[in-house]
């Protein structure tokens, strides 16, 4: 729709490195490529993961960043949001799921989804923190995932099945009701075996694309 920002999704497959820090290593490289005024909003599901990412990044790289999660007071969250909004403030804001509720960050143009909810409405809510009137640039959405894992299953399902990263989904709950159980089983199977159930997964993608 004219007047609304465009979205561009970048799915980033990560090969297991044996250290268990694949997402942090990729995120560190992304930060190194930022220009001084670039802003990145990162959203993940829990405050524990936010705190873990914060600790890991402080070891790996010197970058101005803030946190935003439910155990912070309202004043603390306001200060973090304000610091992120300043031109010379934080380049990276690490948010738990609460960061996708009620706050708008349309001055940022990069969104990192370090994990994905099995809920298209919640995914849209996350993206909506940047996809607002007043957004002046194409929104770059980064979705890193471990190869041959449940992360890959859900990331590709959203992208190849629903096109949910680049287009607004108004009835995503119907897809979850129809395919959520099957997707969850395939995700668990991939995590347990370290291999993708390709035939069954390709069939799921085809059914998802054909579903109305």
Where do the protein language model's features map onto the residues?
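C-terminal accessory region of SF2 helicases/translocases
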Residues: 137-212
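Conserved SF2 helicase motif VI
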Residues: 119-141
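Conserved helicase ATPase core of P-loop NTP-dependent helicases/translocases
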Residues: 63-97
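A short beta-strand element within the Helicase C-terminal
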Residues: 103-115, 140-143
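Conserved interdomain hinge at the start of the Helicase C-terminal
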Residues: 14-45
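SF2 helicase motor core recognition
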Residues: 51-54, 93-109, 127-135
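Conserved helicase motor "Helicase C" RecA-like lobe of SF1/SF2 P-loop NTPases
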Residues: 44-69
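Interdomain linker/hinge connecting the two RecA-like lobes of the SF2 helicase core
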Residues: 1-20
């Amino acid at each position: 729709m004219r007047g609304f920002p465009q979205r561009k999704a970048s799915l980033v497959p990560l090969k297991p490195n044996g250290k268990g820090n694949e997402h942090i290593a990729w995120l560190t490289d992304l930060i190194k490529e930022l220009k001084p005024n670039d802003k990145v909003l990162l959203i993940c599901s829990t405050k524990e993961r936010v705190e873990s990412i914060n600790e890991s990044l402080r070891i790996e790289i010197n970058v101005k960043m803030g946190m935003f999660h439910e155990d912070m007071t309202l004043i603390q969250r306001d200060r973090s949001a304000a610091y992120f909004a300043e031109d010379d403030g934080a380049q990276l804001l690490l948010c738990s799921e609460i960061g996708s509720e009620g706050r708008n960050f349309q001055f940022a143009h990069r969104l990192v989804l370090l994990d994905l909810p099995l809920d298209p409405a919640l995914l849209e809510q996350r993206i909506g923190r940047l996809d607002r009137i007043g957004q002046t640039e194409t929104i770059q959405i980064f979705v890193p995932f471990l190869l041959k894992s449940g992360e890959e299953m859900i990331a590709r399902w959203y992208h190849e099945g629903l096109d949910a990263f680049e287009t607004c989904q108004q009835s995503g709950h119907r897809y979850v009701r129809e395919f959520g159980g099957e997707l969850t089983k395939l995700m668990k199977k991939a995590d347990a075996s370290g291999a993708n159930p390709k035939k069954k997964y390709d069939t799921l993608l085809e059914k998802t694309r054909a579903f109305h």
